[in-house]
Amino acid sequence: DSAHMAEVALTYPSLSMKDMGRVSQWVQKGDFSRLLPEARPMGMYLSLKNLQGQRRYAELLCACKAAIALWEREDTFTILDIYLRMLCATACYELDRVDECDDHLLEAMKIALPNGFVTPFVQSWMTTGCEIEHLLEQRYPQWRDPVERVSMATWKNWIAFHNRYTRETITTLLTQREYRVAQMIV
């Protein structure tokens, strides 16, 4: 129903900002029964992002792999195919399975980049250490600068939105690389 679709629209920014207190109960429980069938893939994605936000990376990886196995179609793809692989990569990175992280990133790049989709890599630039940057340099050098440019352009805007949305403060003094290093130290 429309109330649940409104919750979907409100839940996504909460998950993106790591504001887990605003995530709907039905997303936390993975209960998509009130969503229209067309909206269930988005509900599933939000539930997976919820696992990421809770740092439940082993569960996230298993759930994403299952979703890929059930969702994937041989002759076509959707944006969800790319984002599921990006979530797998993030989970693997956090589980110190860097080679597997790279495999998932390369699968996502193989689908996305020939079609001009850079946003998934911009959005995940910070969640996989320097892996995206290294893989772009090695395998897709023509895409490295465009992805980095868009990433840099959105970084400060993301911080401003985050600070207003969560009423918390992330400094704008650090570069993305410095911020990644600070995250690793913490």
Model-derived regions: residue spans:
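TPR-repeat structural position
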Residues: 20, 57-58, 98
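Solenoid-like repeat scaffolds
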Residues: 1-2, 26-40, 66-80, 106-117
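TPR/TPR-like (Sel1-like) alpha-helical repeat modules
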Residues: 99-117, 137-152
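Residue register of alpha-helical TPR repeats
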Residues: 5-8, 42-45, 49, 81-83, ...
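Residue-level signature for tetratricopeptide repeat
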Residues: 11-14, 50, 91-94
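Helix-turn-helix DNA-binding segment
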Residues: 162-186
